[in-house]
């Protein structure tokens, strides 16, 4: 029922204020003998990938592996395995953040040209001929590239002629989008785009990106022009704009292109061939071809890499169109290197995980609008990170945090003590659950058995469960719906048995801790789905809370669409029609009943507030059954 007092919005700027009235609290009594797509928010270290920012992966396991790869459990631990298992379910969207340390660096390479104008001896007519000679080199950066913002300054050239009279200019720098040594596997290749040459007034190229870790596999290709003024039909063709575009650009590399270098080559060619009628944007410095006639330009020689002069320090002669591509150089994993001290590496990882979930690495992790989320799974993190996950879920208000109890519990009786010591009362919220069991599974990279916590299974199983039942209304718990699978036989621990552990099971149930148990078929199941809120209400059940969060999200989005709309009676009638569509989505299928309507009182009307009332009743669950058997004496009639 609506609250008996005026609701005061939290802010004065236009927004949606949500008030949840939980009218389902149950006063505990004791017997004498006592619509949404499922999305996971994951943070991990991985062999490759864009780093320290949240990215959405919607292409399932293939998209996940293409972006982040998969590595040994011994190096990357459970966080990567959880995310991979969720991706393998094929039933969820992943919001992922790959963490890398500050002392790691990006692989990169700078393409430089060395040129000089040579004059031939005078002929019989007394005239000399000038020829532009150009050689291309891949040059490493002067220092480690710690940020892609330094892509345009990480490599320098002197600009003065060398001993042979060649002047060096930078043409472009290509940098991997993620830190780490994996960037050395990336290569680029530049070839002529003759088709586009016919369509516009620029010299066009194909810029291809390749991965050489398992043969030369083309990852991307772009149509580009190496001139910042190049536009066609109001669309920029400039290589930087095309490749660095956050939506349609490269997911592998970023580039910095230097107009000054290309202009220097053009100016030198005009000295060698003053009769040339091509403009700077039409000139082809890489292949020396006339874009209009496709014939070789006079007075220019592109020296093959095999015939180029000896390279300077950090330089390698290359051909930009080589089928082997131009390899990126350098890059490091920093304190997360595979050969780093294991304890120091673990400490660095834990600090990164804490900073990630606290929103220090990427504040967008806190945004429910940018990255709407269903679950944030623990992954055998230390206490501080577990608490950060719980705080993040509470602050976001759109998802549930599912926390494990590590892999070190050796006695059933110590489960509650671990929870009390680790969490205390700091996680007493309906968006948090505690899952204290662990198991052995096969590492998909090495096929070795490794020990993981409950959240590995939950990461893959919960999205699949929601997909199978077409909604979040079906609990993932109990003897039929909560069967734990996918583990090495007899490896789940601790597992409770009501014939042996009934007192402990009562203790855990009263503390809202979701333990694993054997059922009558000797199958291990998730026995409960309690949230960690203190009072006993309908929202003590995880499925009910998940439905509530979905309804809340739908209502927020609907109300947001009405900002600065009118709220006359005819408008409110229209709004009520819209909200009924949302209510109908949940009615009967996921909840017993739901009603929603817009209204406003005089106080709210004076302040331009529109009030949405939602009333819902969850479906009843079967958790306890009473079996009453009467054994009666037979009667004999005379």
Q: How would you label these PLM feature ranges?
A:
Residues 11-13, 197-200, 213-215, 232-233, ...:
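Long, low-complexity, intrinsically disordered terminal regions
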Residues 120, 124-129, 133, 137-242, ...:
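Extended, beta-strand-rich, solvent-exposed assembly scaffolds of outer structural proteins
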Residues 233-312:
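Low-complexity, serine/threonine/proline-enriched polar segments
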């Amino acid at each position: 029922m609506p609250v008996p007092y005026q609701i005061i919005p939290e802010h004065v700027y236009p927004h949606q204020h949500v008030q949840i009235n939980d009218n389902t609290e149950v006063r505990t009594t004791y017997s004498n003998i006592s619509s949404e797509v499922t999305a996971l928010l994951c943070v991990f270290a991985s062999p490759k990938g864009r780093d320290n920012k949240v990215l959405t992966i919607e292409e399932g396991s293939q998209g996940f592996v293409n972006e982040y790869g998969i590595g040994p459990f011994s190096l990357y631990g459970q966080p990567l395995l959880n995310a991979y298992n969720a991706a393998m379910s094929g039933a969820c969207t992943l919001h992922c953040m790959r963490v890398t340390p500050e002392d790691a660096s990006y692989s990169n390479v700078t393409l430089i040209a060395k040129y000089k104008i040579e004059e031939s001896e005078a002929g019989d007519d007394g005239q000399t001929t000038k020829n532009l000679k150009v050689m291309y080199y891949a040059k490493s950066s002067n220092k480690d590239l710690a940020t892609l913002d330094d892509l345009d300054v990480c490599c320098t050239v002197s600009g003065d002629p060398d001993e042979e009279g060649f002047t060096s200019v930078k043409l472009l720098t290509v940098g991997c989008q993620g830190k780490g040594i994996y960037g050395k596997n990336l290569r680029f290749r530049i070839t002529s785009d003759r088709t586009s040459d016919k369509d516009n007034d620029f010299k066009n190229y194909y810029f291809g990106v390749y991965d050489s870790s398992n043969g030369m596999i083309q990852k991307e290709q772009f149509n580009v022009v190496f001139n910042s003024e190049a536009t066609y039909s109001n669309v920029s063709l400039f290589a930087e704009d095309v490749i660095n575009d956050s939506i349609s650009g490269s997911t592998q590399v970023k580039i910095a292109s230097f107009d000054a270098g290309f202009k220097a080559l053009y100016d030198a060619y005009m000295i060698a061939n003053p009769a040339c009628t091509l403009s700077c944007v039409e000139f082809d410095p890489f292949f020396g071809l006339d874009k209009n006639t496709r014939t070789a330009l006079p007075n220019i020689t592109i020296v093959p890499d095999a015939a180029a002069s000896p390279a300077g320090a950090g330089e390698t002669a290359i051909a930009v169109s080589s089928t082997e591509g131009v390899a990126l150089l350098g890059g490091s994993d920093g304190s997360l290197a595979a050969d780093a001290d294991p304890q120091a590496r673990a400490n660095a990882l834990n600090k990164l995980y804490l900073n990630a979930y606290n929103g220090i690495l990427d504040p967008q992790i806190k945004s429910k609008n940018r990255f709407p989320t269903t679950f944030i799974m623990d992954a055998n993190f230390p206490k501080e990170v577990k608490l950060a996950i719980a705080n993040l879920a509470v602050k976001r208000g759109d998802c549930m945090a599912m926390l494990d109890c590590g892999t070190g519990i050796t006695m059933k009786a110590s489960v509650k003590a671990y929870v009390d010591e680790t969490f205390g009362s700091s996680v007493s919220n309906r968006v948090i659950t505690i899952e204290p069991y662990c198991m052995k599974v096969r590492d998909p990279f090495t096929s070795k058995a490794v020990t993981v916590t409950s959240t590995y299974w939950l990461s893959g199983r919960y999205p699949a469960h929601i997909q199978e039942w077409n909604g979040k209304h079906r609990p993932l718990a109990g003897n039929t719906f909560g069967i734990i699978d996918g583990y090495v036989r007899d490896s789940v621990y601790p597992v409770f048995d009501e014939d042996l552990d009934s007192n402990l099971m009562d203790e855990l149930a009263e503390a809202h801790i979701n333990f694993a148990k054997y059922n009558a078929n000797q199958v291990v199941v998730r026995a409960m789905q309690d949230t960690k809120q203190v009072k006993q209400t309908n929202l003590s059940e995880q499925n009910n809370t998940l439905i509530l969060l979905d309804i809340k999200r739908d209502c927020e989005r609907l109300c947001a669409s009405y900002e600065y709309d009118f709220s006359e009676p005819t408008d409110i009638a229209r709004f009520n029609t819209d909200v009924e569509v949302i209510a109908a989505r949940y009615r009967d299928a996921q909840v017993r009943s739901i009603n929603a309507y817009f209204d406003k009182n005089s106080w709210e009307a004076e302040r331009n507030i529109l009030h949405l009332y939602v009333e819902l009743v969850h479906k009843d669950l079967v958790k306890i059954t009473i079996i009453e058997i009467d054994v009666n004496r037979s009667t004999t009639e005379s």
